Amino acid sequence: MIEGVSVKELRSNLDKVGLTLDIWGDENPPGPLCASSCRMLFPGMLEAWVSRREAAERITCLEGTIKLVLCDRREGSPTRDDVMELFLGEYRFREVTVPPGVLRGWKAVGGRALVFLALEGGGADALFLTPEEAGVPYDWDIVMQ
C-alpha cells in the first residue's frame, strides 16, 4: 500500500425502489473550497498520468468498473516508486483518497462506460504527464484474472 493512500468501503442499501450509496457522511465530509466533477469514461478508454500538486483527490466509481493505478513519485516517501492497482465500481463501492504527489491513472474495464466522482481539495492544480514523462512501470493491457 502506498503511504497516505486510503481505501474506504462504502455502505450501500438496496431496497424495492433502488440503491442508496453513502459517499460523504458526517465522519468524512467534503472539505471547504473543493471542486468536484462527475465523469464518464467510455469502455476501454484510459487517462494517465495525473498528479495533484497540493491537494488530495477522492475517487468513487458509481457505475461500471474502473481500474485505478497509483504510483508514488514523492521525494522522501518510504513507498517512493511503488505501484498500486485497485478495482472499484458497482460490484465493490469504495472511495480512494490519493495524496498530492502520487500519480494516478484510470481505465474503464468491462464492456460498458463507467461513471465516477472525483473530489479535489483546495489548490487542486493538476500536473498532466505523458507515459514517457511519468515513467511508470505498468502495462495497461494486463487484464484482471
Model-derived regions, located:
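Short beta-strand His + acidic residue motifs that chelate non-heme Fe in jelly-roll/DSBH
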Residues: 96, 104-109, 117
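Non-catalytic, conserved peripheral segments adjacent to functional cores
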Residues: 1-92, 111-145
